């Protein structure tokens, strides 16, 4: 069973009238985020360009959680549009508007209209690390093999 946590959401003036982020299927990990651009002023992303797209929402995440802003696979596959800093992290102490940094890797301009699903948001538990300086690390079969070292 998946845990459900309560998250307070503030709808900003330019987000009024848009539905809240929602899961599209019973087992979806992410909720779709919608573009809160003006209805009479869609945002056009030219090839190679990027822009911050507002969602009209602010969150109060509980301590120990983050929101990850991830691409929607359909936008990437069909149009080459993706989240530039994927995954974007929204920390539990951030109270500003959730914006999505989109980039158009496609060859055609892409128009973002009000209410369009532009990204997905995954709520995830956060583990905090305590780093400890050492002069040696435990040995592994992989060792220091990096990029491409485990094969194709």
Swiss-Prot record:
HAMAP family: dUTPase_bact. It comes from Bradyrhizobium sp. (strain BTAi1 / ATCC BAA-1182). Its EC number is 3.6.1.23. PANTHER family: DEOXYURIDINE 5'-TRIPHOSPHATE NUCLEOTIDOHYDROLASE. Pathway: Pyrimidine metabolism; dUMP biosynthesis; dUMP from dCTP (dUTP route): step 2/2. CDD domains: trimeric_dUTPase (cd07557). It comes from the Bacteria. Keywords: Hydrolase, Magnesium, Metal-binding, Nucleotide metabolism. This enzyme is involved in nucleotide metabolism: it produces dUMP, the immediate precursor of thymidine nucleotides and it decreases the intracellular concentration of dUTP so that uracil cannot be incorporated into DNA. The keyword NADP does not apply. This is Deoxyuridine 5'-triphosphate nucleotidohydrolase. It catalyses: dUTP + H2O = dUMP + diphosphate + H(+). Pfam families: dUTPase (PF00692). Substrate binds at residues 72-74, 85, 89-91. InterPro entries: dUTPase, dUTPase-like, dUTPase-like_sf, dUTPase_trimeric.
């Amino acid at each position: 069973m998946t845990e459900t946590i309560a998250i307070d959401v503030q709808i900003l003036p330019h987000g009024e009238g848009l539905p809240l982020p929602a899961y599209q299927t019973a087992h979806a990990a992410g909720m779709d985020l919608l573009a809160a651009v003006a209805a009479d002023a869609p945002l056009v992303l030219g090839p190679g360009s990027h822009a911050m797209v507002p969602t009209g929402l602010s969150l109060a995440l509980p301590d120990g959680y983050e929101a990850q802003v991830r691409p929607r696979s359909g936008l990437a596959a069909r149009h080459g549009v993706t989240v530039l800093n994927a995954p974007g992290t929204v920390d539990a102490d951030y109270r500003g508007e959730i914006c999505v940094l989109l980039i158009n890797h496609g060859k055609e301009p892409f128009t973002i209209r009000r209410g369009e699903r532009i990204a997905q948001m995954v709520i995830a538990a956060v583990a905090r690390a305590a780093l400890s300086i050492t002069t040696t690390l435990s040995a592994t079969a992989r060792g220091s093999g990096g990029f491409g070292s485990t094969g194709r």
